[in-house]
Amino acid sequence: MNIGIDVDGVLLEKCNFQIEEGTKFFNKRVINSKEYDIKKIFDISSLEYNKFWDVKIKEYIERPSIKYASEVIYKLKERGHKIYIITARGTATKNYTDTVDDDYMKTYLIKWLEMNNIYYDEVIFTSDGKVNDINKYKINYMIEDKPKNIIEISEVTNVIKYSSLYNLNVVGKNIIEAYSWYDILKIIEKN
């Protein structure tokens, strides 16, 4: 099978980072912990959002991968599956930070995957909408966390929703919820 894997929120934990770092940075309490976008989590302006990522982007992208991601991905590879990293990272960096650019984000992601021992057959940098690439690479399962992407992708293939506060209410046909990387492995092995 062809397995697509998102980065932010799937390989790299995002929800708690935004809440913990945002609470300190903005000196505010969380307004809505079930939102994907930090602007809505803290009810902040686009300018405040950009300032946050200017300061925090490198700290965020340099953190280690989610526990067992590497281990499970290697097990999937050993079982003959092709692994595609499909990410919007590095396609619109200028929209939220001046600290790094798209090229840096792409180059650093490749380095980060290597540092975290994350196996892949190919890395696909795509715009926020991933459906065209999912169709092109005939992805059987896409592991995704962003609510909008989960819904769009579920129209064309199976989505393993990496569960988070912000996507708990996203349900539907072709959407299977997973709570950990070993949970993901069990879902794929079952099919």
Where are these regions (language model features)?
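C-terminal cap/substrate-recognition subdomain and adjoining C-terminal extension
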Residues: H81, D98-N191
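Flexible, glycine-rich phosphate/dinucleotide-binding loops
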Residues: E20, A92, L168
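Hydrophobic alpha-helix position signal
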Residues: G22-T23, L76, L113, I134
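Short hydrophobic segments within beta-strands
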Residues: D6, I86-A88, I143, Y162
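Short, well-ordered beta-to-alpha junction loops that form the rim of enzyme active sites
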Residues: K14, T87-G90, K146
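Active-site neighborhood of HAD-like aspartate-dependent phosphohydrolases
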Residues: M1-K51
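Short glycine/proline- and acidic residue-enriched helix-loop micro-motifs
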Residues: K51-K58
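Substrate-recognition element of Asp-dependent hydrolases with the DxDx(T/V) motif
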Residues: Y60, A69-Y108, T126
